[in-house]
Amino acid sequence: MKDINPSHTAAWKALQQHFATMKDVQISDLFAQEPERFSSFSATFNDQMLVDYSKNRITAETLTRLLALAEECGVKEAIAAMFSGEKINRTEDRAVLHVALRNRSNTPINVDDKDVMPDVNAVLVKMKQFCDRVIGGEWKGYTGRIITDIVNIGIGGSDLGPYMVTEALRPYKNHLNMHYVSNVDGTHIAETIKDLDPATTLFLVASKTFTTQETMTNAHSARDWFLKTAGDEQHVARHFAALSTNAKAVAEFGIDTENMFEFWDWVGGRYSLWSAIGLSIALSLGFDNFEKLLSGAHAMDHHFVSTPLDKNLPVLLALIGIWYNNFFGMETEAILPYDQYMHRFAAYFQQGNMESNGKYVDREGHPVSYQTGPIIWGEPGTNGQHSFYQLIHQGTKIVPCDFIAPAISHNPLTDHHAKLLSNFFAQTEALAFGKSREAVEQEFSAAGKSPDQVQHVAPFKVFEGNRPTNSILLREITPYSLGALIALYEHKIFTQGAILNIYTFDQWGVELGKQLANRILPELAQDNPIDAHDSSTNGLINRYKSWRH
């Protein structure tokens, strides 16, 4: 990958000049000038996904200049480097190959001169066999009863992705009840297991090192809870499996290493749902649906690696995001799925984006002079319309939004879906085109109001519009289409990191807090006041000690 400061490129300087002509351009004028703008600024992927980016503050010239930035910063070379197994995560000396996990074409991918695909396929076979046994009832608990409930214990990438996917694909779930525990707050594990039967519960402990503090704390509490009923530690092996590479620690915990599912250091946590970390997905939906999820992602991988940049959906979305964040100063993006099953999608890509591109030094270790990752947030529609859309429509901060919806609902109750989608379509129209003072006054006049009655309230009913959105319309949310959608966002994030000259696949920012927590934990064991920190931290710890009894 090229280490290029994007702000020093000719393309960046050209974009700055172009921005001066675009900063006040109205989306409404762009549509007036080109009534068929939709056909020029939208694309369909595999007849499953329509991506409409026409309601953005861009022209054909904007895209040409943004694409020049991608070319100058070596995006094509960066894509090739990732897919070929090059160690592009240089701070950890690792390849980045979540794409290998869903490489349904089974083409060789080499890391250190070794094809990784035989190992990937072997783990998939092992996962399938395990799923078939548990789902089919062949796997029995220590009393001889079949498994009814599965608890995935993990945190970060070992939790967010599997939880998001099993929720998004809930219509495909089988008879197994899936639960997720992540927080080290004891409430999470306590509330999850309090109504479960130890004899019919299977725990999946997801930790590559088998040392993650939150995960192992919860795993030991789950083990203690299980043994209160089961008694014999030999029974642990019938009720616990591991998603890990630390065979020694897994065995010491009491798990049969035959039920340890490995993954590799070239799998980043927030890109790991495609690996053994996705075992809970496969157990919940069936392995055939897990394979369809992989196939959808692989199809998007193929699009990303083989499509020219000017037609490449992840690249186009990435460039539009950089345009807003770095030239307009729009620092956040909202992800707004109009599908209740997708209620964890924004949270998943909050981690996916912010942990990947929330960096302030470039690949050469220098502080950057430009914006890197945006703040990502969002909630499902229409709930969000009744909470934060007020700010999106009329606030002083412009928030570019991604609206996501399926054309076909899994729950076609009366006219629910038509009402949901009418809101989906209306919101992007309202954000783009707004409502003028003149239109407000005409409405009041038609309602029989006098000019005096209108005068004081009209300013509050004006919508400036010109608020940018992307609309992503799926035919239906299926394992295949969801896989493609997730990969679309993954590759958008990668493209932005490549252009912004940062390391997208490390996360050193999570380390300092963990180090300090490990230092503070022993200080909490005693009741005596401490004075080893700043006055604020000392004060908080000492008040906690005085209040905890």
Swiss-Prot record:
SUPFAM superfamilies, per the entry: SIS domain
Entries under PROSITE patterns matching the protein? P_GLUCOSE_ISOMERASE_1, P_GLUCOSE_ISOMERASE_2, P_GLUCOSE_ISOMERASE_3
Pathway membership, UniProt: Carbohydrate biosynthesis; gluconeogenesis; Carbohydrate degradation; glycolysis; D-glyceraldehyde 3-phosphate and glycerone phosphate from D-glucose: step 2/4
Q: List the disulfide bonds.
A: none
Gene3D superfamilies noted in UniProt:
1.10.1390.10, Glucose-6-phosphate isomerase like protein, domain 1 (3.40.50.10490)
Q: What class of enzyme is it?
A: isomerase
Q: What is this protein called?
A: Glucose-6-phosphate isomerase
Organism for this UniProt entry: Sodalis glossinidius (strain morsitans)
